[in-house]
Amino acid sequence: RWQSPKYIIGESYGGTRVMGLAAELQNKQWMYLNGVIMVSPADYKVLRTDSALSSSLNLPYYTAAAWYHKMLPDELQNKDLLEILPLSENYAINVLIPAMAKGGFISETDRNETAERISYFSGIKKKVVLQHNLDIPKNYFWKELLREKNGLTIGRLDSRYKGLDKRIAGDKPDYNSEITSWLHSFTPAINYYVREHLNFKTDVTYNVFGPVRPWDNRNDNVRDGLRQAMAQNPYLKVLIQSGYYDGATTYFNAKYTMWQTDPSGRMRDRFFFKGYRSGHMMYLRNEDLIQANEDLRTFLKESSANGKAAKY
């Protein structure tokens, strides 16, 4: 199939891997890809930077989760999600990052104004934002958002799910509510299918979530590998698919990764981003399963290159 269009797709940690794999295949195997598809990519490079950046990039996700649970001010809550996310994104990039960069040297006036806007876009009370020096950790957000409404927590990988903790007090949820729901659904399904349909009999436990540690990703530089692969191969295009309610690999962090992969901006027309009203696994929502598949089909059709050689 060397003459066929070639694509690789990776989800979550796999999103990081396919960025590196694209460069590896091209440089070591001389295999030139047509497309790289990243589903909820886990590019944690930004999380190792100062919190001024990583915390600011969380805000649009907070807006999405708060909107879903009806915790935003009426001015935002009464609008559609896709109307308010650009407002939160614009504030995060153009106002919040510069404010957070000042750290403890921000003026009291600016500190209070910033806390007010973070509260406005996140559903978290201004007093709580100030108590956290304008930096609300995601663990705390999942615990705090509904604390006074119903005492429930919200999920990490998909914040549409709710959980019930031992105590309403605390700074993080007791468990990831979405995980228990997925395990409850997937575990009996796969075990039934393997045994009854494939007739494969075994007592080995099927791990829905396999062990992934220990690992060392401190030297992760796959972004630049993908950039180089794209520079050398003008027919290589990239599609990123993210769920707005994913609190682990947030959609805005994925956008930031996309922007930073090509600092020159000369390949920006070869990057495509699609967002969905779901979490980490957007295909669990039937409407997004249909739309995500359609987006994939469109991407494949528009990136086949018809067998052209990799040259400008």
Please report, for each region that a protein language model flagged, where it lies by residue.
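Short alpha-helix in the alpha/beta-hydrolase fold that links the catalytic acid
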Residues: G20, L236, T250-Q260
